[in-house]
């Protein structure tokens, strides 16, 4: 509803011994003057495969805030697509990931700035250790200074991505 605030928790966990495949999809719409805080925790065993897609559309002066923690899965992938569809829409995307042991974690963010005065902030941090692998990519489309970022973390590398701000010219 217009001007409302909501908090949603997406918790994906399980024991280390169980073998599983998860394919999760979430489609959220943030209305005018509303704020949505989405908390996502991925903490599954080394024998799990977790593929997740989140689609978010943000209305006028609305804000979508993602707090993402990827702490475990044999293979984990997040595809996040955010559409800043109206003037002064905003997104704040923060997260951390730990790819240790033989885990492989992929994070792909795509932010479309489709209206004037939109704003997005991305702040992701990660660690890869052992034989663990982590992939992070960011595309901020339609922004006045759109940039593409791509980082690959290899064993024994600590990955600390600088935060980035993209704004659509008014």
Positions of PLM-derived features:
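Conserved beta-strand/loop scaffold segments within soluble protein domains that form the structured core
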Residues: 1-170
């Amino acid at each position: 509803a217009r001007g409302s605030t909501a908090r949603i928790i997406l918790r994906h966990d399980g024991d280390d011994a169980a073998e599983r495949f998860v394919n999760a999809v979430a489609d959220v719409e943030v209305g005018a003057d509303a704020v949505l805080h989405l908390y996502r925790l991925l903490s599954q065993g080394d024998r799990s495969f977790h593929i997740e897609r989140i689609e978010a559309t943000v209305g006028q002066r609305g804000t979508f805030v993602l707090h993402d923690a990827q702490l475990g899965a044999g293979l984990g992938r997040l595809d996040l697509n955010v559409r800043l569809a109206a003037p002064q829409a905003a997104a704040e995307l923060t997260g951390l990931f730990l790819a240790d042991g033989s885990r492989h974690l992929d994070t792909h963010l795509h932010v479309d700035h489709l209206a004037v005065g939109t704003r997005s902030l991305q702040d992701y941090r990660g660690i890869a250790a052992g034989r663990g692998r982590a992939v992070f990519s960011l595309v901020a489309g339609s922004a006045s200074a759109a940039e593409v970022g791509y980082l690959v973390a290899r064993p024994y590398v600590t990955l600390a991505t600088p935060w980035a701000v993209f704004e659509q010219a008014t």
